[in-house]
Amino acid sequence: MLIDAITWTADPAIFSIFGREVRWYGLFFAVGFLVGYAIEERIYKHDNAPAGWCDKAFIYTIIATIIGARLGHCLFYGWEYYSAHPLDILKIWEGGLASHGGTIGILIALYIFSRRVTHRDMLWAVDRLAIPTALVGALIRMGNLMNHEIYGHATSLPWGFRFIENVSVWHTYGAQPIFTEPSHPTQIYEALCYLAVFGLLMYMYWKRRAGDRPGLI
């Protein structure tokens, strides 16, 4: 029997505690940062960087990612609403992050970090952050998959996914799910690409000494 499509019914939430949902997206996001920090710490130690540099870089990155991703979502995808309800920008627990906003925030943070902490070329810090970032990106895309979001165009391929179009109403109120037509699971495609990039960057850094040439990674 041939499969014509995969019906995706994953619940965005894992469980609730004290009235707050713990979602797959948030879990993947948090795990990505923790694993990313472990990789970054190993890289900084390998480079004999002064003690404290990695911790400071991590703090800069965390703050910049959250602020940048949140503002990116509000400005690029919900300006009409958030311009009328500016205090709702602070309600980050309700969801709404944009990866490109986070990227802009991180680049600004690394510029400040390089000026105030390392006093080195900004590319030195960017190279070292790029490696774990590829892995974090893969995990975040899996979070998007669990949220039934950013899927691709319709497809007749057997691995097309039928996502729940009204996922918020279905999840919150138990409404009958409305499925999309079979679509490309671009979240999975992108996650696999990020993993390939992560493997390549790890190889370049550890085997080809790419970290010695700022900007190469």
Please give the residue ranges for each predicted region:
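Hydrophobic, membrane-interfacing alpha helices
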Residues: 1-217
